[in-house]
């Protein structure tokens, strides 16, 4: 866990102030990747913070140093932060600021939504009632009476309508001059009868649900009518008049009022006859609509429950389809190798793409991971989402599939066969694992280069009428390759790295371009894809090494320029071996060009062979007793001010516990321009204290030690004067082998085993007079091609040659015996006789 939590910090400490405080601590020398101070919704500090570090060692160091220390007057507590998922599963809310359970939040949200729907429904009903009232106010009495008489029989009982109609029409009035005592009980009975009639009218109206515009009268309207009639009855009783008085126009209107539909134009009110036809249908459909709405609501709830798939399941489904992950919240110092080491254990990776900001040349904080298998991508998502990585919580999401511009099979079939092969080869170039010989060169460019520097024609070097043209071509290539090796070594290229299978993401080997191609032309060809570092072109001008500052730019250039035409040739691109440069590139704003065109010179190996390696002066000092925590930048910073300083490096070894990481070995080397500067630096810096360690410095004998190591390794091998040449072309003759190897020493014997048809078997043996001559031939011809085949040379022991000879003799005897024996049919005939 590279993330820690600091509790009880001062309340007024924010992110900037806490970062400044941590960076000001000299003992806390570590890269801080994230600082997060917890706050409430109101912006008040909760007095704890999360701090992220680049690795776990720095986090442990910070815990040991900061725990139970004081930040101003507050004593802080520091320990490892819990994992995001573990914190949500194990911890319960302990303060009013803590988040509540997700289920409670969902329940609360559903209740609020139900209340909001009820309020909206009430408001709508109220609005409909107001619209109905306004509609009735616009009708004249005859229209209202017509609507009353034209109401559907199914919505009201006919006898009730008659009773109401009779009651409304015949309203007997008691004479005022009659004696009240004679009719003492009659008016009361009539009043009760009238009241009962009115009550029956109201009940029938309520039961029948008279519909004028497709809606029933609401209970509130009926209650309002009853209240008005009761008030009128009381008034009549108090005034001494009979309660069965005729209804006024307003009273009759209120009894028959209705509501219009929402958004119904007022000009359509007069067209009453057409609307009456749809009253019954609308009234009957209202109940059906309510039932249907209930069923739809139940179905929607069921559908909602079925579609209630969690976000994680949706992400897993998308990842299974695309096999691609999107990462965010990465540190700006994160590299693609860090992501490869993190996601590599889950399965085979197709691509790791981290976009780079062109202005700052730093990552943008997000990346894409392509897996070969969808199950591996899903497993990586489940394991690493919300997990700390370099001090930050890694956020993993499904990514969209990469856009492909490949043509389908039908479109490809319409193209010529040559064009089809070119497109397929170009599209598979980036993912292809095939590679040529690392120092492969165009044969025509090799001969043209040598002829140009010698000032002769190519026909003078390769005579078409000569039988040894292939040997001359091989010797020319050998010379150019040896010259190229020396040039690369002078410019900080580690030739031993070409033996490694791991490939670099930002360095390309550019091959097969014509002779005469300049560094400026290659720069203009590759620079549009990104910022370039070093560009190395050897004197022969047949191969180049181009370094990009950013890996994404290098990948883009590789995919766009592979197998493209350059002048009269096809450009071959190959990823260079990892760590091909011994020193890192110092960015200076423009690419560093290294191009050298010289006359033909003797190779360095030939010069060194005639000199004693121990007589060479050294300009390198050996520094030991370094602190294991001392970084490369600090080590270089100490020696950089010295006169004649060139470079400084701390030796490191791979960390077995952390793939992709390195551990300091406690010593290093500093290189100067000359021996005098190295001696002066040794006397000046010997005993200097760096990170608490006293440095011990002396002159380095690295060159002598390297030569001794080479001699030791060579002595452990079965050395001798005999060489075995493998992968020999079948067209090669004994004379070709003699001409090729004779250029490096005096040959004692050459033997090319042949088949029964007198053709070569694909290998040969050569014996030199001295072991030095054999070693020179081995070293020079290691990357040579003869008739298009890469020669493989190794020392041949006597046992190897004896075994080969014994195998050849055995095969010859078997062949002779088979030729002398009779046929199988003949044997069977003799035996039967």
Curated annotation (Swiss-Prot):
Region ranges (Disordered): 160-251
A Pfam family this chain is assigned to: RRM_1
First-listed, main subcellular location of the protein, grouped into a coarse class: nucleus
Residue ranges annotated for the RRM domain, each copy included: 2-83, 323-401, 506-578, 619-702, 721-798
Coiled coil region boundaries: none
Record-level GO BP terms: rRNA processing; small-subunit processome assembly
Keyword DNA damage listed: no
Family per record: Belongs to the RRM MRD1 family.
PROSITE patterns per UniProt: RRM
Summary of the function given for this chain in its UniProt record: Involved in pre-rRNA processing.
Name of protein: Multiple RNA-binding domain-containing protein 1
GO cellular component: 90S preribosome; nuclear speck; nucleolus; nucleus
InterPro entries, per the entry: Mrd1_RRM3, Nucleotide-bd_a/b_plait_sf, RBD_domain_sf, RRM_dom, RRM_MRD1_RNA_proc_ribogen
Protein's cellular compartments: Nucleus
Biased composition (Basic and acidic residues): 188-205, 213-222
Keyword list, A-Z: Nucleus, Repeat, Ribonucleoprotein, RNA-binding, rRNA processing
Single GO term (MF): RNA binding
First and last residue of the signal peptide: none
């Amino acid at each position: 866990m590279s993330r820690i939590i600091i509790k009880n910090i001062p309340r007024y400490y924010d992110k900037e102030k806490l970062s400044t405080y941590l960076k000001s601590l000299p003992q806390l020398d570590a890269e801080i990747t994230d600082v997060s101070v917890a706050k409430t919704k109101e912006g008040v500090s909760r007095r704890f913070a999360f701090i992220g570090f680049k690795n776990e060692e720095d986090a442990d160091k910070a815990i040991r140093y900061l725990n139970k220390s004081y930040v101003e007057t507050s004593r802080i507590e520091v320990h490892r932060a819990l994992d995001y998922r573990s914190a949500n599963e194990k911890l319960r809310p302990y303060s009013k600021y803590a988040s509540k359970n997700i289920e409670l939040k969902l329940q609360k949200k559903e209740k609020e939504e139900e209340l909001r729907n009820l309020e909206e429904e009430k408001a709508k009903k109220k609005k409909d009632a107001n619209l109905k009232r306004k509609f009735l106010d616009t009708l004249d009495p005859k229209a209202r009476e017509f609507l009353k008489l034209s109401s559907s029989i199914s919505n009201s009982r006919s006898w009730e309508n008659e009773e109401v109609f009779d009651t409304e029409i015949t309203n007997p009035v008691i004479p005022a001059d009659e004696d009240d005592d004679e009719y003492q009980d009659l008016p009361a009975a009539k009043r009760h009868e009238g009241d009962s009639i009115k009550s029956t009218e109201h009940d029938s109206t309520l039961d029948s649900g008279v519909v004028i515009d497709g809606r029933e009268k609401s209970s509130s309207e009926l209650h309002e009518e009853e209240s008005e009639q009761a008030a009128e009855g009381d008034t009549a009783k108090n005034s001494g008049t009979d309660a069965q008085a005729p209804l006024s126009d307003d009273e009759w209107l209120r009894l028959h009022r209705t509501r219009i539909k929402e958004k119904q134009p007022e000009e359509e009110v007069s067209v009453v006859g057409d609307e009456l036809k749809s009253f019954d249908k609308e009234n009957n459909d209202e109940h059906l609509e309510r039932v249907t709405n209930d069923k739809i609501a139940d179905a929607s709830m069921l559908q909602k429950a079925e579609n209630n798939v969690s976000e994680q399941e949706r992400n897993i489904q998308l990842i299974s389809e695309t096999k691609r992950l999107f990462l965010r919240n990465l540190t700006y110092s994160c590299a693609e190798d860090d992501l490869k080491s993190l996601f590599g254990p889950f399965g085979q990776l197709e691509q790791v793409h981290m976009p780079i900001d062109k202005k700052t040349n730093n990552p943008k904080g997000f990346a894409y991971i392509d897996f070969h298998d969808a199950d591996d991508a899903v497993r990586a998502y489940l394991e690493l989402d919300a997990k700390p990585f370099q001090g930050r919580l890694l956020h993993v999401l499904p990514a969209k599939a990469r856009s492909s511009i490949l043509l389908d099979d039908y479109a490809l079939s319409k193209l010529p066969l040559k064009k089809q092969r070119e497109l397929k080869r170009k599209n598979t170039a980036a993912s292809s694992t095939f590679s040529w010989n690392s120092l492969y060169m165009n044969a025509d460019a090799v001969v043209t280069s040598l002829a140009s520097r010698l000032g002769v024609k190519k026909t003078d070097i390769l005579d078409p009428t000569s039988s040894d043209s292939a040997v001359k071509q091989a010797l020319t290539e050998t010379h150019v390759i040896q010259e190229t090796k020396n040039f690369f070594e002078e410019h900080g290229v580690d030739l031993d790295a070409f033996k490694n299978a791991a490939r670099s993401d930002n360095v390309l080997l550019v091959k097969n371009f014509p002779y005469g191609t300049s560094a400026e032309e290659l720069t203009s060809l590759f620079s549009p894809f990104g910022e370039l570092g070093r560009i190395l072109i050897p004197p022969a001008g047949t191969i180049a090494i181009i370094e990009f500052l950013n890996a994404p730019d290098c990948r883009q250039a590789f995919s766009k320029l592979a197998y493209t035409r350059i002048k009269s040739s096809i450009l071959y691109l190959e990823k260079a071996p990892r760590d091909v440069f011994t020193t890192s590139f110092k960015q200076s704003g423009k690419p560093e060009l290294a191009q050298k065109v010289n006359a033909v010179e003797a190779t360095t190996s030939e010069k060194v062979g005639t000199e004693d390696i121990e007589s060479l002066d050294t300009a390198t000092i050996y520094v030991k007793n370094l602190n294991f925590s001392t970084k490369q930048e600090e080590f270089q910073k100490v020696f950089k001010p010295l006169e004649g300083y060139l470079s400084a490096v701390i030796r490191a070894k791979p960390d077995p516990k952390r793939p992709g990481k390195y551990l300091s070995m406690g010593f290093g080397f500093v290189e100067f321009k000359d021996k005098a500067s190295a001696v002066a630096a040794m006397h000046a810096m010997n005993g200097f204290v760096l990170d608490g360690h006293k440095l011990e410095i002396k002159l380095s004998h690295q060159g002598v030690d390297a030569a001794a190591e080479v001699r030791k390794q060579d002595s452990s091998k079965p050395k001798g004067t005999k060489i075995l040449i493998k992968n020999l072309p079948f067209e090669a003759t004994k004379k070709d082998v003699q001409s090729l190897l004779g250029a490096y020493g005096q040959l004692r014997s050459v033997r090319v085993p042949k088949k029964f048809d007198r053709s070569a078997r694909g290998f040969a043996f050569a014996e030199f007079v001295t072991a030095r001559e054999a070693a020179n031939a081995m070293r020079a011809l290691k990357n040579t091609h003869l008739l298009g085949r890469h020669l493989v040379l190794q020392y041949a022991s006597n046992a190897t040659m004896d075994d080969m000879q014994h195998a050849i003799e055995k095969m010859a005897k078997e062949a002779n015996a088979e030729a002398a024996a009779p046929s199988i049919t003949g044997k069977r005939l003799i035996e039967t006789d």
